């Protein structure tokens, strides 16, 4: 299990919240105090709640479910994209399209269009078009890739969302709640924790804090996926042994 230590949290600045004048009173239970007009997050609670979130994400992956990493603010884009790819999951790190979950059938049509364009450029069939047409198709492809590239392989709705800054991703969270999809989120002192199923109190603005927490969630996915693979492999071996015994008995 990938534990998170108080030292890691402190070094990444996870304990720094927002200015005291910019806060959500619902975050009071997660606040240790204030220093120089900045709220300090209670890292003991962060450690405990992080473990709950980690266990859920691991179990979600072990059950064969997928997770969608969401973080469109500039500080989160790289970590969200890179860590999702590292653990073989999906991500949205540019712009959340309204209906990305609640109208997934329509979004999937755009994904299919992107895949067709990719194939045209890969197999050379784009050469059948004029230079002007090919340029227009390339622009369309780039636009679709920017928004949908991170969910190109997502054939169905995810089993969970991991979100950086719920205040910035209200539409994504609202859609997840409508569909009953659990949400894990890094929640800063200016956020409303109520819609979040697994709250991780922490700094959602510092790049190091975002990277640390996102990478740990990716570790949880990897751990769960590996456990699932091990079980499936054991099951396959047992099935093969049973089949071999049956054929031996028949002989």
From Swiss-Prot:
Keyword Ribosomal protein assigned: yes
GO cellular component, one term: cytosolic small ribosomal subunit
Gene3D superfamilies cross-referenced by the UniProt entry: Glucose-6-phosphate isomerase like protein, domain 1, Helix hairpin bin
MF (Gene Ontology): structural constituent of ribosome
PROSITE patterns in alphabetical order: RIBOSOMAL_S2_1, RIBOSOMAL_S2_2
Keyword tags: Ribonucleoprotein, Ribosomal protein
HAMAP family per UniProt: Ribosomal_uS2_B
Family under the similarity heading: Belongs to the universal ribosomal protein uS2 family.
Stated name of the protein: Small ribosomal subunit protein uS2
Source species: Geobacter sulfurreducens (strain ATCC 51573 / DSM 12127 / PCA)
